Curated annotation (Swiss-Prot):
Keyword Mitochondrion annotated: no
EC number from the UniProt entry: 4.4.1.21
Keyword Transmembrane attributed: no
Subunit structure: Homodimer.
Function comment: Involved in the synthesis of autoinducer 2 (AI-2) which is secreted by bacteria and is used to communicate both the cell density and the metabolic potential of the environment. The regulation of gene expression in response to changes in cell density is called quorum sensing. Catalyzes the transformation of S-ribosylhomocysteine (RHC) to homocysteine (HC) and 4,5-dihydroxy-2,3-pentadione (DPD).
Residues reported in the UniProt entry to bind Fe cation: H60, H64, C127
Family: Belongs to the LuxS family.
GO BP: quorum sensing
InterPro entries from the UniProt entry: LuxS_sf (IPR037005), Metalloenz_LuxS/M16 (IPR011249), S-ribosylhomocysteinase (IPR003815)
Full protein name: S-ribosylhomocysteine lyase
Annotated TM spans: none
Gene name as annotated: luxS
Record key words, sorted: Autoinducer synthesis, Iron, Lyase, Metal-binding, Quorum sensing
């Protein structure tokens, strides 16, 4: 078993979660493909690690909303995935490396979440846990995240 000081294969396992200050958006990883494609993964942290977390229905609904809406603002988005610790999401993009633009896209997306009238694909045909959604909860998360927009670049460390 590896100790806390041993370098791990997973980038986020090497992040000292006691030294970050949520909410924030940070570049978690960059990978170059053999043909020159660039994959950039962002750590989009909503809650302070080990102190608070998102409840599952709200997180689940925000996942659906952002996954659908963000693509209206950026065609380079590959994925928007929740973290198992329920403190944030990973945003993965292809051939795009402009941090400032990512912040703008996230801001526009969260503003659109606040205007949403339903959670997309929140039915049994399109979702594996359709009963586990709350539009109000997702909007509350988006509102809280947006209210600290000026802090997104302040990671702590």
């Amino acid at each position: 078993m590896k100790t806390p000081n041993t370098k791990m294969n997973v980038e986020s396992f090497n992040l000292d979660h006691t030294k970050v200050k949520a909410p924030y958006v940070r570049i978690a990883d960059r990978k170059k493909g053999i043909n020159g494609d660039l994959i950039v993964k962002y750590d989009v942290r909503f809650k302070q690690p080990n102190q608070e977390h998102m409840d599952m229905p709200s997180l689940h609904s925000l996942e659906h909303l952002v996954a659908e809406i963000i693509r209206n603002h950026a065609n380079y988005v590959v994925d928007w995935s929740p973290m198992g610790c329920q403190t944030g999401f990973y945003l993965t993009v292809l051939n795009h490396d402009n941090y400032t633009e990512i912040l703008e896209v996230l801001e526009k997306t969260m503003q659109d979440v606040l205007k949403a009238t339903e959670v997309p694909a929140s039915n049994e045909k399109q979702c594996g846990w359709a009963a586990n959604h709350t539009l109000e909860g997702a909007k509350n998360l988006a509102h809280a995240f947006l209210s600290k927009r000026d802090e997104w670049s302040e990671i702590g460390i």
